[in-house]
Amino acid sequence: MGACSGLEMACWDIIGKAAGKPVYELIGGKVHDKLRCYTYLYPTNSKGEHDYDCPDLAVECALKNMEQGFTALKFDPAGPYSAYSGHQISLKTLARSEDFCRKIRAAVGNNCDLLFGTHGQMTPASAIRLAQRLEPYDPLWFEEPVPPGQAEAMAQVAAKTSIPIATG
């Protein structure tokens, strides 16, 4: 689905350039002066390498992003991952995920939304277990808990958690 939307955006861009108009004018006009956006957490260690295993580095990164004006932060609480692997997350990983979310929520308070994206890497049962452990941290959404295109599995997860399920 991502490839289709990317292709559509490219087509709109081409049409806009040919017409000499911004795309928003072609699709009905300007609606907002500014829009809220989120950023993904890319914590780095002292060597400048991305390090997704240290909750303290993730907290540091979250605070820097908030200083830049972001009010929504997306991250994978269950990484490292292998997209479409459909694996069952271990208790150790569940505890680590909860620790990440607890520390980030404590650092940002209610000043920032947390968005979880897990790259479609889990079975429905595993996604449900993770969602239920992370509900206390009040995430705005849980994106692709199971592989995209598995509507029944997404519905199964959505029925067992208060966290809104997203895809895209």
Q: Where are the regions that the model predicts?
A:
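Short, surface-exposed acidic/glycine-rich loop or hinge patches that mediate macromolecular interfaces
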Residues: 121, 147-148
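Generic hydrophobic alpha-helical scaffold/packing signal
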Residues: 131, 143, 155-158
